């Protein structure tokens, strides 16, 4: 193994990133070193690349970017048990304390002292990465690396879609970005019908169809609520899944969901949102879930089994694959332009 490696690094507090050569890290106690096979770009990585307000408040350059990964364990640090060299793995990004009130109740996904791998630590946009052993997930060999690297965001989609019953339910999904597309795949694999998708981008509406959406709506040109009511015989949808983070989409979805329906919110909003709680939530007796992270480790088992079942249609979602990191700038600019689904760097 070489002593040097290539990595995409946020080298300074400004727009962009650099491809640099750095030392291969050594795993310490409770850590493992993985050789990266595949790694994918998340919206969080794009925020860091763009150096937006959130990134400026959280990221401390210089730092290796990236957190979605599939790789092979090549070295095990002192004190690590149950993980061996050669294991094919992915990584849960929430590094939890195990001691706070939430953790002691088994609610690790809302740990009050969470650190994010690849945000608060060096990440996986590199040929090798050091990972906390407690965050390692072993993958079945049957799952290809370009799918295995998507398990972390896929877990977000699974928790959003499966927060309540979904089989045989009518569904509205607002936002067909990468997470929304994963949500479509999970909803279809889980027996939802019809799956209606509201998305302003022509490119992403076409992707939504390829993934399995039964109906697509352009909210800039069509009346979303009217279209949903027409499709559902005036009843509204049983389940509303909000992936966009657009306040207008939230309002439209709450109007379009049937009384006593279920709402799952994953999209993050730019600020405070004004909602008619009385008429859109309380008097409709809606059940509303806020979704963050993934349930550890229940969601990972669900994700892995869905992938192994062969029922998830993910190929249309992976719109771009790059061999290595050389074209990382092109990849990020395409994402900024909204012209991608998931972007995957393949290192093997």
Swiss-Prot record:
GO process annotations (BP): L-threonine catabolic process to glycine; protein tetramerization
Residues the record lists as binding Zn(2+) 1: 42, 67-68
Keyword Acyltransferase: no
Catalytic EC class: oxidoreductase
Chief location of this protein within or outside the cell: cytoplasm
SUPFAM superfamilies, sorted: GroES-like, NAD(P)-binding Rossmann-fold domains
Documented EC number(s): 1.1.1.103
Binding site for NAD(+): 179, 199, 204, 266-268, 291-292
Cofactor binding, note field: Binds 2 Zn(2+) ions per subunit.
Binding residues annotated for Zn(2+) 2, in chain numbering: 97, 100, 103, 111
Top-rank taxon: Archaea
InterPro entries membership: ADH-like_C (IPR013149), ADH-like_N (IPR013154), ADH_Zn_CS (IPR002328), GroES-like_sf (IPR011032), L-Threonine_3-DHase (IPR004627), NAD(P)-bd_dom_sf (IPR036291), PKS_ER (IPR020843), Zn_alcohol_dh (IPR050129)
Role description: Catalyzes the NAD(+)-dependent oxidation of L-threonine to 2-amino-3-ketobutyrate.
Name of this chain's protein: L-threonine 3-dehydrogenase
Species: Pyrococcus abyssi (strain GE5 / Orsay)
């Amino acid at each position: 193994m070489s002593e040097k490696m290539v990595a995409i690094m946020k080298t300074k507090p400004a727009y962009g990133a650099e491809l640099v050569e750095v030392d291969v890290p050594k795993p310490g106690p409770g850590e493992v070193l993985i050789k990266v096979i595949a790694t994918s770009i998340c919206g969080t990585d794009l925020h860091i690349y763009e150096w937006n307000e959130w990134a400026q408040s959280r990221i401390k350059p210089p730092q290796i970017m990236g957190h979605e990964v599939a790789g092979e364990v090549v070295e095990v640090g002192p004190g690590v048990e149950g993980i061996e060299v050669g294991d094919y793995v992915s990584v849960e990004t929430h590094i939890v304390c195990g001691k706070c009130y939430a953790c002691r109740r088994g609610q690790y996904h809302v740990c009050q002292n969470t650190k994010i791998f690849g945000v608060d630590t060096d990440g996986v946009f590199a040929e090798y990465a050091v990972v906390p052993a407690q965050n390692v997930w072993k993958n079945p060999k049957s799952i290809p690396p370009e799918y295995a690297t998507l398990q972390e965001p896929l877990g977000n989609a699974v928790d959003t879609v499966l927060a309540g019953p979904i089989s045989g339910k009518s569904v509205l999904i607002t936002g067909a970005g990468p997470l929304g597309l994963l949500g479509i795949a999970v909803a279809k694999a889980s027996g939802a019908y019809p799956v209606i998708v509201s998305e302003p981008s022509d490119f992403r509406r076409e992707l939504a169809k390829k993934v399995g959406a039964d109906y697509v709506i352009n909210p800039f040109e069509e009346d979303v609520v009217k279209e949903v009511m027409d499709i559902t015989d005036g009843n509204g949808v049983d389940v509303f899944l909000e992936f966009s983070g657009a306040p207008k989409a939230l309002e439209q979805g709450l109007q379009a969901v049937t009384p006593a329906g279920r709402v799952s919110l994953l999209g993050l909003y730019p600020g405070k949102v004004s909602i008619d709680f009385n008429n859109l939530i309380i008097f409709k007796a809606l059940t509303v879930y806020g979704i963050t992270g993934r349930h550890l480790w229940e969601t990972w088992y669900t994700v892995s089994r869905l992938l192994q079942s062969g029922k998830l249609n993910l190929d249309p979602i992976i719109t771009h694959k790059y061999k290595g990191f050389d074209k990382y700038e092109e990849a990020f600019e395409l994402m900024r332009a909204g012209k991608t689904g998931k972007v995957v760097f393949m290192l093997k």
